Amino acid sequence: MVETISPSELRQEAERAYKKKDYLSAAKAYQAAAECYSQPGEQITAAEMLNNASVAYLQAGESEAALQATLGTEITFSEAGDTRRQAIALGNQAAAYEALGQLESAAKAYQTSSELLQEIGDQELRSVVMQSLSAVQLRLGNKMEALFTMQAGLEQIENPGLKQKLVKKILRSPFSYFNRLT
């Protein structure tokens, strides 16, 4: 007798595996759930499962699988008018590109994600994306651009932690120097 597992059960299985840090099993279960959710009317849930799989694959060190899992999901969210999840999908793609060493593609995806988050006013998540974008810009050798991006990202945080406050203070120094020169 063949036992059929529901998409909901697959999702729960994936969440349990993720909590146990069994990321590869989690990713595979999320992908299986996505396949089950690929019925008409369930595309958004399928895309969400694929993004969860992408995150799990990244945690497992499977960068190419992470990228493949999330590619195209931003379109599903865009067509559904879900800008926040569209931006998150682009951020997931950017993280996969970054892990693969495709820094130009990572920067472009982070930038688009940041713009979408700004449109909807999600400053907290935008701050995280801007900090990731800054790190990529730095790796690309764009030091000044990285500095400006990091400062813009930190300015968005309403209640910065101690580390963020310190970084903000350090970043103000070069800007105040440049202001004195002009």
Predicted regions and their residues:
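Intrinsically disordered, low-complexity regions
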Residues: 1-182
